[in-house]
Amino acid sequence: MRTRGKAPVLVLGVGNALLRDDGVGLRLLSDLSPEGRSWDAEIEFLDGGTQGLALLGRIAGRRALLILDAVNLGAAPGTVHVLREWRDCAARSATAHESNVSELLAVSTLLGECPEKVAIVGIEPHRIATGMELSDPVARALPAALEAARGLLLELTEAAVPEVERGRKPVDSFGPMVIPFGMR
């Protein structure tokens, strides 16, 4: 079931590709979305760039949100962070941009529009400076971050879009199968 005509799950890549490691969220999004994988049609991939609060309307009405970003928590550069509860990092201004993701999520919560499930996969940046190449530690962390993002995306999709809504019978269910309207 789509909410307000939107896919229930949004994968949001954020950052500035012109500031080296700050663009890692966009790189993760690019590597995740077109990889030839048959992702569920209930998922939308969005390059949020540096739009900040302008993204409020894009996340409103979703059931789940996976954010891909540079995350600065003071760990070693290239450390992959998987944050299943965004409020844990909100006070630390975790993202590497001025208009950060925590602010976006806090405002959407105040407006009653924050998705029920929000997770963040990010990589600790090494160098935020003019340039388009990722630093070596961040580039080396991409495969691990992609693996974490894939796993979380599957988890979020299962939580946000139950199988019966997708017209499939759950494996562990012995109840009647739900047949989508028009398929009888």
Regions found by a protein language model. Name each.
Residues 13-14, 75-78, 96, 123, ...:
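Residue-level signal for pocket-adjacent positions within structured domains
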Residues 23, 27, 50, 96-102, ...:
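Conserved active-site and cofactor/substrate-binding residues in soluble primary-metabolism enzymes
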Residues 2-12, 17-88, 160:
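Nucleotide and nucleotide-moiety/phosphate-recognizing core
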Residues 70-118:
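Helix-loop-strand module that forms the ligand-binding subsite of alpha/beta enzymes
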Residues 101-184:
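Phosphate-binding/catalytic loops
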